Regions:
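N-terminal auxiliary segments of SAM/dcSAM-dependent transferases
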Residues: 1-24
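Conserved alpha-helix/loop element of class I SAM-dependent methyltransferases that forms part
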Residues: 28, 32-35, 41-62
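Class I SAM-dependent methyltransferase SAM/SAH-binding core
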Residues: 63-116
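A short acidic, Gly/Pro-enriched loop at the edge of an enzyme's catalytic core
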Residues: 114-125
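A short SAM/SAH-binding and catalytic strip from SAM-dependent methyltransferases
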Residues: 124-138
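A short glycine-rich, Lys/Arg-flanked "PGG" loop and its adjoining helix->strand segment in the class I
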Residues: 139-154
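Conserved class I S-adenosyl-L-methionine
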Residues: 154-183
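Core SAM-dependent methyltransferase catalytic element
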Residues: 217-243
Length: 243
């Protein structure tokens, strides 16, 4: 896992360079990001996100943060008049593409997983959907998530993971051959989608991700596979009593 922070695609890069390259990926794909997600996953990412939103179980008065929230898919599923929902993302372009000109009940704020513009222990629930594999330093990000969560607060992390063995050859062939072509045709940036695929390939599997969370002192850690493990939702709590 530590290696993820030093790679971009198949290249070894220094962490600051990786950060800049990841930013440039999302800057370039922002206007086609939602369309590409629908095409690449046949719309199934929407079902995964609905399941994530259901697990959030929002309550009146809560502060819910959607970290790496991008165009705000998840934030829109959990927003409501009786709670505050904030998207935090370093890409102004992604947030602009999602915000459009519509008024919504979502607040948008620039920030990274490694450094969020929030005081300690203020967040009831933090979601991160297809964002954690983009962060440059996952341990720092998990420590930062811990910092902003209230005691008893929960992290819900939806991410691509390792599918069941019989599915893997088909999944890898699809990722390797189909997605970069779609990226070229639709998003006009095949290299950006090459990075996305490579970052999925290098990301820890379900059990390793669970161990990373436990190593950062999260408790009650469990996960739920979606679509035979193509995606996975990890749920983890900051210990303490929810106030
Ligand atoms: C694959 S998109 C996911 C967007 C959205 N959450 C979704 O599920 O559709 C990844 C997002 O992570 C953001 N990102 C990249 N590096 C980040 C970092 N260090 N901290 C937080 N977000 C980051 C990108 O700007 C991008 O919006």
């Amino acid at each position: 896992m530590a290696n993820l922070s030093k790679t971009f695609g198949e290249r070894e890069v220094a962490p600051p360079e990786r950060e800049a390259l990841v930013r440039s990926v999302f800057r370039r794909v922002a206007d086609r990001y939602d369309l590409m997600n629908d095409l690449m996953s046949f719309g199934i990412h929407r079902l995964w996100k609905r399941s994530l939103a259901w697990a959030v179980d929002p309550r009146p008065g809560q502060l819910i943060v959607d970290l790496a929230g991008g165009t705000g898919d998840v934030a829109r599923l959990v927003m409501g008049a009786d709670r505050r929902v904030v998207v935090i993302d370093p890409s102004v372009e992604m947030m602009q593409a999602g915000r459009g000109s519509r008024k919504s009940l979502v607040d948008w704020s620039a920030g990274t997983a490694e450094s969020m513009p929030l005081p300690d222990a203020c967040v009831d629930t933090l979601t991160i959907s297809f964002g954690i594999r983009n962060v440059t330093d996952i341990d720092t990000a998990l420590a930062e998530i811990w910092r902003v969560l209230k005691p008893g607060g929960r992290l819900l992390c939806l991410e691509f993971s390792t599918p069941a063995a019989p599915l893997r050859p088909f999944y890898e062939a699809y990722n390797r051959h189909v997605i970069p072509r779609l990226g070229a045709m639709v998003a006009r940036h095949p290299d950006a989608y090459h990075y996305l695929i490579e970052s999925i390939r290098r990301f820890p599997d379900q059990e390793e991700m669970k161990r990373l969370l436990e190593a950062q002192r999260f408790t009650d850690v469990y996960y739920r596979n979606y679509s035979f493990g193509i995606a996975c939702l990890h749920v983890a709590s900051r210990p303490g009593n929810a106030g």
